[in-house]
């Protein structure tokens, strides 16, 4: 998938599939699938490193995981999250952070929020030739300001703000916008108001595409079960079964067998 395909898919009403990915083996699997695009999300801080929030993701962490994923991917378009405060200190600092991610293999960056400074930064990056994906609704990097993980845009004032944010991000030059944890009717309204595509997570079926976290949709963990996640596989159960089978065969001296020995 190329950058221009995002808008083409919206025009042709073809849904966009996006999935997070954090390491080389997983990227190699994704490369053989029909997934359109991959996000090296700052959710790696939680899903892989065990931190309680995405705030703990650093530019070094994002750079390392981007390098690993880029080495394994094939035709999929690769986007990397700019981590917490990665675009807040100065434009020069932001450009340097983005440069590191692009040199690591990202083809675009995703930036959370739509305040005036953020939109100016996005516009600056786009004018420099860097593709930027926006992100509105529940923005995990602002989780303390939002008062926790909860649905955004539930009243008319919040809904109008989100609609304006989406429009502002489009005007700033974003090629797509993620809408997270927003009522489906509002997400559909935002989607219909934009020329650029929307990618939803917890935003209903009316967006131009969907994104899920690798570990969530494959059932690699069972402690986090938000309503918007569908588990397409029960990987954790199968992994535990395989591990216990290995232990049993070692104890019973069924492994290694002759075919595993020299």
From Swiss-Prot:
Supply the EC number(s): 2.1.2.11
Q: What is its main location?
A: cytoplasm
Q: Which reaction does it catalyse?
A: 3-methyl-2-oxobutanoate + (6R)-5,10-methylene-5,6,7,8-tetrahydrofolate + H2O = 2-dehydropantoate + (6S)-5,6,7,8-tetrahydrofolate
Name assigned to this protein: 3-methyl-2-oxobutanoate hydroxymethyltransferase
Q: Where does Mg(2+) bind?
A: 42, 81, 112
Q: What organism does the UniProt record list as the source?
A: Legionella pneumophila (strain Lens)
Which enzyme class, named as a word? transferase
Q: How does it assemble?
A: Homodecamer; pentamer of dimers.
Please list the GO terms describing molecular function. 3-methyl-2-oxobutanoate hydroxymethyltransferase activity; magnesium ion binding
| Biological processes annotated in GO | pantothenate biosynthetic process
Signal peptide range: none
Describe cofactor binding as the record notes it. Answer: Binds 1 Mg(2+) ion per subunit.
From the UniProt record, give the pathway where this protein acts: Cofactor biosynthesis; (R)-pantothenate biosynthesis; (R)-pantoate from 3-methyl-2-oxobutanoate: step 1/2
Q: Which residues carry out catalysis?
A: 180 (proton acceptor)
Tell me where in or outside the cell this protein is found: Cytoplasm
């Amino acid at each position: 998938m190329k950058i221009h395909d995002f808008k083409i898919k919206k025009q042709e009403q073809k849904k966009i599939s996006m999935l997070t990915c954090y390491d080389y083996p997983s990227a190699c699997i994704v490369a053989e699938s029909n997934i359109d695009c991959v996000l090296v999300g700052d959710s790696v801080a939680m899903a892989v490193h065990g931190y309680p929030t995405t705030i703990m993701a650093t530019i070094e962490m994002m750079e390392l995981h981007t390098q690993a994923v880029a080495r394994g991917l094939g035709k999929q378009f690769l986007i990397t999250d700019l981590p917490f405060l990665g675009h807040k200190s100065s434009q020069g600092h932001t450009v340097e952070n983005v440069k590191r991610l692009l040199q690591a293999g990202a083809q675009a960056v995703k930036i959370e929020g739509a305040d005036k400074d953020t939109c100016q930064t996005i516009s600056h990056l786009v004018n420099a030739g860097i593709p930027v994906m926006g992100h509105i609704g529940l923005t995990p990097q602002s989780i303390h300001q939002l008062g926790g993980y909860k649905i955004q845009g539930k009243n008319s004032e919040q809904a109008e703000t989100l609609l304006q944010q989406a429009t502002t991000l489009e005007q700033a030059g974003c090629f797509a916008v993620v809408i997270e944890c927003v009522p489906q009717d509002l997400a559909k309204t935002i989607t219909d108001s934009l020329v650029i595509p929307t990618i939803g997570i917890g935003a209903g079926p009316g967006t131009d595409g969907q994104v899920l976290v690798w570990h969530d949709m494959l059932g690699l963990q069972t402690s986090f079960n938000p309503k918007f996640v569908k588990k397409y596989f029960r990987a954790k159960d199968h992994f535990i079964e395989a591990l216990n089978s290995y232990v049993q065969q070692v104890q019973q001296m069924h492994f290694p067998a002759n075919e595993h020995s020299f």
